[in-house]
Amino acid sequence: MKIINVKIIDNRIYKHFYLPKYATSGSAGLDLSACLDKPLTIYPGKTHLISTGIAIHISDTKIAGVILPRSGLGHKYGIVLGNLVGLIDSDYQGELIVSLWNRGPKKYIVYPGKRIAQLVFMPIIQVRFSIVKSFIPTERGPHGFGHSM
C-alpha cells in the first residue's frame, strides 16, 4: 500500500471527524467528509465549497488524486461535484476542498462529518508530443461521438 502524506488543517478532525477512509476492503475511493461547524443548506442550482479539514501531498509524479462524486448523492439527491471531477496534482500541498452542486429539485442539507465525495489515486503517465503530418489509418479513423455504436 502506498503512503500519502496528510496534514491536518482543522483540529476537529481529531475530535469530531475522521480522516478519509475506505468504506470496505474492496473500495477504490476514500470517503471525504464535510468539515463544517454547522449544517449547510445547498439550494437547487447552487454550489458551495466545502472544507475537508485536510491537505495532502502526493509527491510521487507518477500518481494523481481524483475527487469524484459519491454515486448515491448524485442519484438520490442530485448532489454532484461543481467541477465534475477534481484533479489533485502530485505537487499540490493545499487543503482538499470539495465543490458541491445541487442539480436536484429540492434543497439538500450537508451535516458536519457527512461523507460528500471520494478520493481515488490513479497512476499517471506523462507524455511528450511528436508532431506528424498524418496518422497510420485505422478502422475508425477520425469519426467520433457515437460513431462506434
From Swiss-Prot:
Gene3D superfamilies named in the record: 2.70.40.10
InterPro entries xrefs: dUTPase (IPR008181), dUTPase-like (IPR029054), dUTPase-like_sf (IPR036157), dUTPase_trimeric (IPR033704)
Pathway membership: Pyrimidine metabolism; dUMP biosynthesis; dUMP from dCTP (dUTP route): step 2/2
Pfam family, one: dUTPase
Positions annotated to bind substrate: R70, S71, G72, N83, L87, I88, D89
Major enzyme class: hydrolase
Reaction(s) catalysed (UniProt annotation): dUTP + H2O = dUMP + diphosphate + H(+)
Keyword Transmembrane belongs to the record: no
CDD domains for this protein: trimeric_dUTPase (cd07557)
EC number: 3.6.1.23
Single GO molecular function: dUTP diphosphatase activity
Disulphide-bridged cysteine pairs: none
Biological process according to GO: dUMP biosynthetic process; dUTP catabolic process
Keywords: Hydrolase, Magnesium, Metal-binding, Nucleotide metabolism
Cofactor: Mg(2+)
Matches recorded under HAMAP family: dUTPase_bact
Similarity annotation: Belongs to the dUTPase family.
Function, in words: This enzyme is involved in nucleotide metabolism: it produces dUMP, the immediate precursor of thymidine nucleotides and it decreases the intracellular concentration of dUTP so that uracil cannot be incorporated into DNA.
Protein name: Deoxyuridine 5'-triphosphate nucleotidohydrolase
